[in-house]
């Protein structure tokens, strides 16, 4: 059996050592991050938002126009369009009753909200929600929907002010259990929410 001899010069050894050192520190920093903060991904927020699908509400002006709203397909984009804000999209199915009889419309909504962490509840809320864009089909319903949008906005704002978008659980993972116990606030980064354990 032959033994293969490998001769490494000093420069190669230095490069290998530096590479291993960099890898060690990268792993160390990653481990430290897990001990000092918890990250909630966009995907996790969207999975939690799915629980708010099929939100239903009656809105309008009594005696003039009333609408039954069904909200579906909620999705979030975290800190991408605007720093420290969450952009939500969703579909609204609307059945309108007015002096002109029953009518139906579909709205594609775009909303923005401020993520806020409630330390006592261990929950993330989407506060001060605002509808920033609404596409209506059929187009002939656009004027009616425009008059109803402020009522829809207020209804959704009130709902998300009271209902958390994401609640930390001690059962899902050790990291999440630590976050629920030691969380100090909330930071918004593109694509994720970061909960630090220290001030």
Go through each PLM region and give its residues.
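Short, Lys/Arg-enriched N-terminal segments with co-localized hydrophobic residues
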Residues: 1-12
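Bacterial N-terminal signal peptides that target proteins for export
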Residues: 10-20
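Extracellular/lumenal and peripheral-membrane lipid-interaction modules
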Residues: 32-199
């Amino acid at each position: 059996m032959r033994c293969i001899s490998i001769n490494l010069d000093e420069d190669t050894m230095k490069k290998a050592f530096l590479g291993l050192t960099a890898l060690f520190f990268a792993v160390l920093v990653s481990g430290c991050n897990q001990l000092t903060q918890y990250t909630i991904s966009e995907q996790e927020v969207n999975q939690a938002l799915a629980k708010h699908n099929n939100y239903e509400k009656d809105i309008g002006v009594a005696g003039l126009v009333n609408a039954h709203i069904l909200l579906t397909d909620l999705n979030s984009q975290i800190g991408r369009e605007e720093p420290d804000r969450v952009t939500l999209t969703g579909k609204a199915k609307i059945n309108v009753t007015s002096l002109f009889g029953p009518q139906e419309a579909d709205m594609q909504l775009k909303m923005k909200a401020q993520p806020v962490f409630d330390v006592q509840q261990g929950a993330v809320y989407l506060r001060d929600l605002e509808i920033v864009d609404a596409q209506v089909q059929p187009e002939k319903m656009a004027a009616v929907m425009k008059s109803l949008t402020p009522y829809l906005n207020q209804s959704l704002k009130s709902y998300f002010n009271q209902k958390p978008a994401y609640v930390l659980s001690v059962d899902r993972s050790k990291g999440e259990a630590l976050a629920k116990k030691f969380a100090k606030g909330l930071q918004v980064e593109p694509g994720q929410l970061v909960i630090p354990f220290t001030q």
